[in-house]
């Protein structure tokens, strides 16, 4: 089986970049890091797992919120160090409550001109404090 090239080293951990994309619309939902163990769990379960560089641990997307990502297809780039997971997103992908983490549009001078997406859930109702 071909595996990603986990060439990015952060906090001593070998990682690759993972992009979650809506399998129907092509909308980019989020970008995260993934290590070999999280990649293997993702392939085995067909549910997205990532590696948190701030918590130094694997996390199952939706473990706390229930907003999981069901894997439909996996793509590797030419260097095999970036992965696209084409997913069926259940609920929102972003911890802010938005469907996608990419909901801010910037003007030419870099100012946020709009948040063009309504929230699909209230984070205060989902995440423990």
UniProtKB/Swiss-Prot annotation:
Gene3D superfamilies named in the record: Phosphoribosyl-AMP cyclohydrolase
An MF annotation (GO) of this entry: phosphoribosyl-AMP cyclohydrolase activity
Protein's recorded name: Phosphoribosyl-AMP cyclohydrolase
GO terms for biological process, alphabetical: L-histidine biosynthetic process
Binding site for Mg(2+): 77, 79, 81
UniProt cofactor note: Binds 1 Mg(2+) ion per subunit.
Residue runs in coiled coils: none
Family statement drawn from the similarity comment of this UniProt entry: Belongs to the PRA-CH family.
PANTHER family: HISTIDINE BIOSYNTHESIS BIFUNCTIONAL PROTEIN, HISTIDINE BIOSYNTHESIS BIFUNCTIONAL PROTEIN HIS7
Subunit structure, as described in the record: Homodimer.
Cofactor section: Mg(2+); Zn(2+)
EC number: 3.5.4.19
SUPFAM superfamilies documented for this protein: HisI-like
Catalytic activity from the UniProt record: 1-(5-phospho-beta-D-ribosyl)-5'-AMP + H2O = 1-(5-phospho-beta-D-ribosyl)-5-[(5-phospho-beta-D-ribosylamino)methylideneamino]imidazole-4-carboxamide
Main subcellular localisation: cytoplasm
Enzyme class: hydrolase
NCBIfam families attached to this UniProt entry: PRK00051.1 (NF000768)
HAMAP family: HisI (MF_01021)
Native species: Methanosphaera stadtmanae (strain ATCC 43021 / DSM 3091 / JCM 11832 / MCB-3)
Pathway: Amino-acid biosynthesis; L-histidine biosynthesis; L-histidine from 5-phospho-alpha-D-ribose 1-diphosphate: step 3/9
């Amino acid at each position: 089986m071909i595996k990603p090239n986990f060439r990015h080293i952060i906090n001593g951990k070998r990682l690759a970049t993972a992009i979650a994309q809506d399998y129907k619309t092509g909308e980019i939902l989020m970008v995260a890091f993934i290590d070999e163990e999280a990649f293997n769990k993702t392939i085995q379960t067909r549910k997205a797992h990532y590696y948190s560089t701030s918590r130094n641990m694997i996390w199952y997307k939706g473990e706390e919120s229930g907003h999981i990502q069901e894997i439909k297809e996996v793509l590797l780039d030419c260097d095999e160090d970036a992965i696209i997971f084409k997913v069926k997103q259940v609920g929102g992908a972003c911890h802010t409550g938005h469907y996608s983490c990419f909901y801010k549009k910037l003007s030419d001078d870099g100012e946020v001109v709009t948040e063009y997406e309504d929230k699909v859930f209230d984070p205060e109702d989902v995440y423990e404090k």
